[in-house]
Regions:
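Switch/coupling loops of ABC transporter nucleotide-binding domains
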Residues: 2, 32, 81
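Conserved acidic segment of CheY-like receiver
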Residues: 2-21, 56
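Conserved SAM-binding loop
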Residues: 6, 36, 85-86
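Short, well-ordered amphipathic alpha-helices
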Residues: 14-24, 43-44, 71
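Short hydrophobic/Thr-rich beta-strand motif most characteristic of the beta2 strand and flanking loop
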Residues: 26-39, 46
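CheY-like receiver
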Residues: 45, 50-127
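Conserved binding/recognition cores within well-folded domains
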Residues: 115-150
Length: 150
């Protein structure tokens, strides 16, 4: 199951992104879970719950702790999380490279950009997975999570 987080200080965009993702996953028949957060501070406070998100949609321009600062802290704990910046301002696009964001989406293009973005992310994630057969059954693992096989 894909774990997805949306972090935006505007409720309208949190709901819009969630609706677009729900529509996307309905057509792909994939299992997913979406959590929404109104700020970087609230998002990071949930880190104590040990939730590791596969994909995070992050607004850049937020009060107090902005999206770049929040993403930097996410990267410190989860280097393989797929970060997508969603913003109304093109000015910060280059900042996304500092935290290895996979996409930088303008809010006025969400309807067309989200499906393309998700296709690219899922393709990238599938390339990083390997299926193994164990005594207890089969399992698909991310190659980045494999430390040792005996």
């Amino acid at each position: 199951m894909l774990q997805i987080a949306i972090c935006d200080d505007e409720q309208y965009y949190r709901k819009k992104i969630q609706t677009l993702l729900t529509q996307y996953f309905y057509h792909k028949d994939l299992e997913y879970s979406i959590q929404s957060y109104p700020s970087g501070e609230v998002f990071l406070s949930q880190r104590e719950n040990s939730v590791k998100y596969d994909i995070v949609f992050m607004d850049i321009s937020m009060k107090e702790l902005d999206g770049i600062q929040t993403a930097s802290q996410i990267r410190a704990f989860h280097s393989d999380t797929q970060l997508v910046f969603v913003t109304a301002f093109i000015d910060y696009a280059l900042e996304g490279y500092k935290v290895n964001a996979v996409r930088y989406i303008m809010k006025d293009t969400l309807d067309t950009a989200i499906p393309e973005c998700m296709d690219a992310i899922l393709h990238k994630m599938r390339l990083a997975q390997v299926r193994f057969s164990f005594i207890d059954g089969d399992a698909t693992l991310y190659t980045d999570n494999i430390l040792y096989i005996e």
